[in-house]
Design a protein with these regions (language model features):
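Hydrophobic beta-strand segments of well-ordered beta-sheets in folded domains
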Residues: 14-20, 99-102, 141-156, 182-183
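DG-centered beta-turn motif at the end of beta-strands
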Residues: 87, 98-110
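Well-ordered, non-membrane alpha-helical segments in soluble/globular domains
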Residues: 1-6, 78-85, 122-136, 164-174
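VWA/integrin I-like adhesion module and closely mimicked acidic/polar interface patches used
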Residues: 108-165
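Surface-exposed acidic, glycine-flexible loop patches that form ligand/cofactor-binding
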Residues: 8-12, 89-95, 139-144
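Von Willebrand factor A/integrin I-like adhesion domains
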Residues: 156-183
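Von Willebrand factor
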Residues: 1-96, 99-103
Length: 183
């Protein structure tokens, strides 16, 4: 569950900012920002009010995640790497103590740059992942991702879907770890 990585699980007086970007056919969306402020002086805080604030924050996050599953893709394109790289580079320059990116996607890029829906291009990825890596990183460079933890979540529909996801996820993990992110 996403709450396990929350700064609030470590200390209820912490603050937290959560930014959610959807991967779409146009390559960018307006981010959804949710936050809860840190308690400035914990000794003067009200435990009951803080618990209510935290529960409200968690409920707002849960509602956003639940609403994301409602819209079905079925779109012609998906700019997966662009969206992920922009989110990672934003985190790389952030001064937050804890940086996490949660990606819920099949990771199947389908853009003018590359398509994991194309069997020939998927074969190239299997045989020569470094050449595909160079294509993506030339177009969308990544900064040093030290201190960023990335979670890749997807629920495959069948064995074939799972197999393809594993290939693409391994590709992403290779890119992420080469830029010092952890997963």
């Amino acid at each position: 569950e996403w709450k396990a990585g929350s700064a609030l699980t470590e200390n209820k007086n912490n603050g937290e900012q959560l930014r959610i970007n959807l991967i779409t056919d146009v390559g960018f969306t307006k981010p959804i920002n949710l936050s809860i402020d840190a308690v400035p002086i914990p000794l003067l805080g009200n435990d009951y009010n803080r618990k209510t604030e935290i529960n409200t924050y968690y409920e707002n996050v849960r509602q956003v995640f639940n609403s994301m599953g409602i819209e079905k893709s079925g779109k012609a394109n998906s700019f997966v790497f662009k969206s992920i790289s922009e989110a990672l580079n934003t985190l790389a320059v952030s001064h937050s103590d804890k940086k996490q990116l949660i990606v819920t996607s099949d990771l199947r890029e389908n853009s003018p740059l590359y398509s994991f829906h194309n069997q020939e291009m998927l074969s190239i990825l299997k045989k020569s992942p470094d050449s595909v890596k160079n294509i993506f990183l030339t177009k969308y460079p990544l900064m040093d991702l030290s201190g960023i933890v990335v979670f890749l979540y997807y629920e495959p529909v069948d064995y074939s879907d799972s197999d393809v996801f594993e290939i693409i996820a391994d590709f992403y993990v290779s890119i992420l770890t080469s830029h010092n992110a952890t997963n």
